[in-house]
Amino acid sequence: MPNQVVNYVEAHDNYNLHDLLEEFHPHDDLETLTKRIELATAMNILMQGLAFMELGQEFSRTKLVGTGPNGQVTQADKERAMNSYNAPDQVNQVDWNLLSKHQDSVNFIRKIIQLKTTRKEFSYSTYEEIYQHVYVRQAQTNSGLIIFEVKDKKHYLVIFNASGTPYRLENADKLKLVVSNNRSKINTEVENLDELTL
C-alpha cells in the first residue's frame, strides 16, 4: 500500500539536507542552496506515499557549528554534525531565527504540504490508483528534469527542474501556475488548482 511507503530526504541520522548540500556544493551561493533544499523537499512531499520531514528542513536548519579559527568549520565539526546523537546542545539546537530568515522557503513548503494534504491526486491509497492516474514522462539523460502528470478529475503537470536553466513548456498559455519556487512568480493561490509546475 502506498501509505506504507515513507519518503524522506532528511532524517536525524547523518547530515541534514542543508549540511549535505553544502558539503556537495561548497561554492553555491545562499539562493542556490535554498532552491536545492526547496526542490528536494518538494519532490519528497509530492511523491506518492507518506512524506517525512525533519524539524527545520523547511528553513535550512544546520548542525554545522564551527569551532576552528575565526569560527571555521573543521573536519571534526563535520563529523559531529553527521552523527550528532551525543553532540552538545549547541549542535542539536534549533535556531528559530532561521524561520524568519527563510520565510519564503517556509511559505513555499507550506503550499506544497497543502497540495499534498488537500488533493487526493498526490496521496492515492492504492497502487492501482497510482498506475491508473500517474504518468512519469521519460527523461532525457542528464536533463535535470523529472516530469510527471496526474490525470484524474483534475489534471496536474509537475515539473522538477534541477538543470539550472529555464524549461519551456509547449502550450504554457493554457496552463495555470499553481506553485513555484521561482521568486519572480506570484503564486499565492493554491485553491481551484488545475495544473502544477515547480
Regions found by a protein language model. Give the residues of each.
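Residues at the C-termini of beta-strands that transition into short coil/loop
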Residues: 9, 179-181, 194
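Loop/helix patches that line or flank the sugar-binding groove of alpha-linked glycan CAZymes
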Residues: 2-172
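Beta-strand-rich binding/interaction modules
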Residues: 165-185
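C-terminal beta-strand-rich structural cap/linker in extracellular carbohydrate-active enzymes
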Residues: 186-198
